[in-house]
Curated annotation (Swiss-Prot):
Positions occupied by motif Twin CX3C motif: 43-66
Membrane topology category: Peripheral membrane protein
GO molecular function: identical protein binding; metal ion binding
Annotated keywords: Chaperone, Deafness, Disease variant, Disulfide bond, Dystonia, Membrane, Metal-binding, Mitochondrion, Mitochondrion inner membrane, Phosphoprotein, Protein transport, Translocation, Transport, Zinc
Modified residues (Phosphoserine): S57, S87, S94, S96
Domain notes: The twin CX3C motif contains 4 conserved Cys residues that form 2 disulfide bonds in the mitochondrial intermembrane space. However, during the transit of TIMM8A from cytoplasm into mitochondrion, the Cys residues probably coordinate zinc, thereby preventing folding and allowing its transfer across mitochondrial outer membrane.
Subunit: Heterohexamer; composed of 3 copies of TIMM8A and 3 copies of TIMM13, named soluble 70 kDa complex. Associates with the TIM22 complex, whose core is composed of TIMM22.
Name the UniProt record assigns to this protein: Mitochondrial import inner membrane translocase subunit Tim8 A
Disorder noted: Mohr-Tranebjaerg syndrome: An X-linked recessive disorder characterized by postlingual sensorineural deafness with onset in early childhood, dystonia, spasticity, dysphagia, mental deterioration, paranoia and cortical blindness.
Amino acid sequence: MDSSSSSSAAGLGAVDPQLQHFIEVETQKQRFQQLVHQMTELCWEKCMDKPGPKLDSRAEACFVNCVERFIDTSQFILNRLEQTQKSKPVFSESLSD
């Protein structure tokens, strides 16, 4: 192996920051799309009795309430998970006690 190929091989371990940022953004987009899909499916099943040319006021109110509850519940779960992780001791620390 010559010096140019060995230096490029050594660089394979480093991730391009722009590529890493792009992947993070795309992953966030995917997660958001999954949440929207879950919310749409859940609220559609709950609120839509029979599809028609126009959304009636009862169904509209149901959709609004469903979306708000979905967001509230998702936020509650995220907050609870954060609290749980913060209160847990690090695994290696708990073994040393």
